[in-house]
């Protein structure tokens, strides 16, 4: 998440501006925002940045499910009882994506332009709204992504993870400017285990004020 901020300074500055507009009292008093301020204020671009970080970085390499009935997935027949390995990291940034002709007609999420699926672009999670300030609101269903899986067996720590990610990102971007590290310390290489972890976890900071 912090690596994406360093690699995309325009996104980082847009987020910092959104945070300062959301917490004018904290800015005027030159202090960090409180937990109540962080989680009691609707900031669509903050939520969008967290979600885009999860989409691009990935949390798990895959998950496993057993088919409880005969079905067809992307044109392939899957008989009941089959163990299905679902790749969580890849489909959301795949270029080109799976052909639309084999996709399910009952999709519950929107679709994105396949040409920029590999680009870190938080605004893809913002949708028009007639009631939200600025005319945009965050939507978790804006596109295809499931970093914590779905259904009854989805990650039970999902809510805590979002709480922590929102807190950490807000506080770091509020207080610091994340600058790009040297290439050898800022690769996208990762190690897969229980979770998908970056191989290099270095940051370069300067004060934001």
Model-predicted segments: where are they?
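A structural signal for well-ordered alpha-helical segments within the folded catalytic domains
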Residues: 44-51, 142-146, 163-170
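Cytochrome P450 heme-binding "Cys pocket" and the immediately downstream C-terminal segment
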Residues: 9-13, 150-154, 158-196
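Conserved cytochrome P450 K-helix/beta-meander segment immediately N-terminal to the heme-binding cysteine loop
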Residues: 87-135
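Active-site-adjacent bridging/hinge elements
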Residues: 133-147
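C-terminal helix/juxtamembrane-tail motif
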Residues: 196-209
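Short, small-residue alpha-helix embedded
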Residues: 1-6, 168
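Cytochrome P450 I-helix active-site segment
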Residues: 7-59, 74, 80-82
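Hydrophobic, well-ordered secondary-structure elements that form the walls
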Residues: 53, 78-81, 120, 151, ...
């Amino acid at each position: 998440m912090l690596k994406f901020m360093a690699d995309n300074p325009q996104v980082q500055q847009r987020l910092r501006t959104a945070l300062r507009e959301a917490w004018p009292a904290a800015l005027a008093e030159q202090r960090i925002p409180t937990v109540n301020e962080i989680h009691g204020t609707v900031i669509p671009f903050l939520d969008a940045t967290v979600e885009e970080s999860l989409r691009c970085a990935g949390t798990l390499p895959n998950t496993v499910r057993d088919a409880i009935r005969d079905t067809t997935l992307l044109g392939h027949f899957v008989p009941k009882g089959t163990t299905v390995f679902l790749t969580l990291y890849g489909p959301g940034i795949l270029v080109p994506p799976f052909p639309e002709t084999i996709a399910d007609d009952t999709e519950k999420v929107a679709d994105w332009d396949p040409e920029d699926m590999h680009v870190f672009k938080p605004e893809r999670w913002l949708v028009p709204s007639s009631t939200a300030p600025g005319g945009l609101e965050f939507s978790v269903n804006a596109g295809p992504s499931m970093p914590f899986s779905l259904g009854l067996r989805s990650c039970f720590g999902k809510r805590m993870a979002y709480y922590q990610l929102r807190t950490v990102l807000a506080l770091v971007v509020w207080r610091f400017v994340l600058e790009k590290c040297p290439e050898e310390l800022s690769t996208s290489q990762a190690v897969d285990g229980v979770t998908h972890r970056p191989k290099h976890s270095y940051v370069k900071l300067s004060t934001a004020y």
